[in-house]
């Protein structure tokens, strides 16, 4: 039975994550869908009229909850590089091929999200007049497909910080066992979701930014899994 699953897990659907991403973009990027209302509704949970639930400079708390998860991802990436360079000294359940896939996928997801931010021209909640931003760095909230004035920010969509956490969705494509794949989905969603929620509570992102990031991570990981086929190898490959 294990072998019969290999062809399927090495050909994960790219249509489904692409459709989910398109749905998110359409729902939040167009007027009249309710997406803009939902974004503002979620932000209202963290905005008290004068500041965000988590201030921009939260001292040690920020270092722990913002830098901590990033440090964990860096350590994981270093571990993957070790497994790639020294597979004989690495856990047998990982193997070089899976380590290469995970490293490449995580890097590609983070790079894709950060590069897209430069062209989508979306502002963070902190940069909006409605949330107390002060001129000349104060803007109206414009949706993805709205025409933007010169100088409009382009540093929010998709979410860069959460992309590192959602990149762990790659774990779901590295093994063929259903229970392990489910574990990968949970790890990626929880890690990325926590990182995204923290940024929402700081006024650095809307819900839409975070959801789009998760969908992009899913799509990129699926594309790379079809190409690299990490699940179609033995535990020690």
Indicate where each model-derived feature is located.
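Membrane-interface loops
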Residues: 95-177
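Membrane-embedded catalytic cores of phosphoryl/pyrophosphoryl-handling enzymes
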Residues: 3-19, 139-237
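Alpha-helical transmembrane spans of integral membrane proteins, capturing the lipid-embedded, hydrophobic core
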Residues: 71, 75-76, 102-111, 214, ...
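Cytoplasmic juxtamembrane regions at transmembrane-helix boundaries
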Residues: 80-103, 170-189
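Alpha-helical membrane-inserting segments
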Residues: 77-81, 112, 116, 220-228
